[in-house]
Amino acid sequence: MSYELQRPGEEMPIEEQMARTSLFTRLEDLVAWSRKNSLWPFNFGLSCCYVEQVTALTPVFDQARFGAEVIRASPRQADLLVVSGTVFHKMAAPLLRLYEQMRAPRWVISMGACANSGGMYDVYSVVQGVDSFLPVDVYIPGCPPRPEAVLDALILLQQQVGAQRRPLGVTVGNAAGLGFEAPRRRDQRRDERMAQTLLDPPEKL
């Protein structure tokens, strides 16, 4: 970037002014860029993995560098849900309700072995993978994962969000508004996944 001095009152050609002060891009690229760089996580934790998630917010790891430091206390103000810890069957229905209260577009990170696959708790009361009832975008392995893994997952999610070209949901004239949600593979088995909120007998696990 080059700098040059300009005297007060000196006129600059309009083309040069526009080149210095204006940015030209497509609207969908601008929206994708802003979503990518301003993820708002929902303040939600279930177990020991949540401690590592909060550690990523400390100055040592500085999650603010990635634009995801604004932790929201309400799901209606968040667009990122990090499921960190053991998900019990009793917690599945409230967790799904919190996810449904988040505004679209929204994303889910499954953090830790327990959230990914039930971990070492292969018992009747633990959901064997949060992806059985939520659409997961990024998985973080580990028991518990290190804060660096949380930052890696954020970077990976930002790359996915930046590459998505979702409709903006604008209504023009008599046209119907376009939705935000991109089709997901797990929607084909949605009814089967929604049944996960009920306790299964131990012999089915």
UniProtKB/Swiss-Prot annotation:
Coiled coil: none annotated. Residues 184-194 have a biased composition (Basic and acidic residues). Keywords: 4Fe-4S, Cell inner membrane, Cell membrane, Iron, Iron-sulfur, Membrane, Metal-binding, NAD, Quinone, Translocase, Transport, Ubiquinone. It is found in: Cell inner membrane. InterPro entries: NADH_UbQ_OxRdtase-like_20kDa, NADH_UQ_OxRdtase_20Kd_su. It catalyses: a quinone + NADH + 5 H(+)(in) = a quinol + NAD(+) + 4 H(+)(out). One of its GO terms (molecular function) is NADH dehydrogenase (ubiquinone) activity. Binds 1 [4Fe-4S] cluster. Its cofactor is [4Fe-4S] cluster. Belongs to the complex I 20 kDa subunit family. This is NADH-quinone oxidoreductase subunit B 1. [4Fe-4S] cluster binds at residues 48-49, 114, 143. It holds the Pfam family Oxidored_q6. NDH-1 is composed of 14 different subunits. Subunits NuoB, C, D, E, F, and G constitute the peripheral sector of the complex. One of its GO terms (cellular component) is respiratory chain complex I. The gene is nuoB1. Its EC number is 7.1.1.-. It is a peripheral membrane protein. Residues 184-205 are annotated as: Disordered.
